[in-house]
Regions:
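Conserved S/T- and glycine-rich ATP-binding loop of Class I adenylate-forming
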Residues: 57, 63-66, 100, 150, ...
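Alpha-helix/helix-capping structural signal
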Residues: 2, 78, 155-158, 211-212
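Conserved AMP-binding/adenylation subdomain of ANL enzymes
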Residues: 81-99, 106-193, 202, 223, ...
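Conserved pre-ATP/AMP-binding loop-to-beta segment of ANL
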Residues: 28-32, 38-62, 69, 93-99
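Conserved A3 ("GATE") glycine/threonine-rich loop of ANL adenylate-forming enzymes
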Residues: 155, 209-217, 229-234
Length: 234
């Protein structure tokens, strides 16, 4: 077994921030190292916590982004803090004991922020899909897990709406029924309930992002009063 002896700041490159290097020692030297550092024993004043600042580097996110050229993106504390504050503001109903199905890559800050970090902070149970994603696999997982929150890219919602809703929604009979006061709300409610069931039946909200949502599909979601938020372009 090994333990951490010390942390030392090492300047690897004058253009890069200092890097802390861990020095490792064997377990049998633990007591000697402890006594060397704290000859009078560990006191409360010896415990010093690092004071974080908003501009401090939190992570280097290695991604291709929109340029297709892989690069390391330096993400400060501020970027993640602001996203977590935003999530708390717009998703106040979510909390401990609820469930989310994580499908987006965590190398992307959209997936990391709203499918992993926020859920971890408020105590939501996270189920990760570790297989190649397909609409059939995703729908099966949604039916089994019945998540409270779904965060997806537009492609999934667009496929479900186009294949499962639009053919009936745009049929001559339904078009007539949608124009009749009183009947319209009942018909639209049936479509909303069907889409909710396809996504697990237990949804608080669906967050759609990563790309633009098709305007025809979005209009249907608005008409049936489906609980969704478009996060693309924030």
């Amino acid at each position: 077994q090994q333990i951490l002896k010390s942390l030392e700041n090492v300047d690897l490159d004058k253009e890069l921030p200092g890097v802390q290097v861990c020095v490792i020692e064997q377990q049998d030297r633990v007591e000697a190292l402890f006594n060397e550092r704290y000859p009078e024993g560990l006191k409360p004043e010896d415990v010093v916590y690092h004071a974080q600042t908003a501009e401090e580097l939190l992570m280097i996110n290695y991604t291709s982004g929109t340029t297709s050229e892989p690069k390391g993106v330096m993400i400060p504390q501020r970027a993640i803090w602001s996203n977590m504050a935003f999530a708390k503001e717009v998703l106040p109903q979510l909390g401990g004991g609820q469930k989310v199905l994580s499908m987006l890559p965590t190398a992307h800050l959209y997936g990391m922020s709203f499918e992993l970090l926020y859920e971890f902070i408020v105590g939501i149970h996270i189920t990760l899909l570790n297989r190649a994603l397909s609409p059939a696999l995703i729908l099966k997982a949604l039916s089994s897990i019945k998540p409270d929150l779904v965060v997806v890219v537009p492609m999934l919602i667009e496929k479900i709406v186009r294949k499962g809703i639009l053919p009936k929604y745009n049929s001559p009979v339904i078009k007539v029924l949608r124009k009749i006061p009183g009947v319209r709300n009942i018909v639209l409610g049936k479509f909303r309930d069907g889409l909710m069931q396809a996504l697990g039946g237990n949804l608080y909200e669906v967050i759609i992002g990563g790309a633009g949502l098709n305007s025809e599909v979005e209009q249907v979601l608005k008409d049936i009063k489906f609980p969704y938020t478009v996060g693309y372009g924030m």
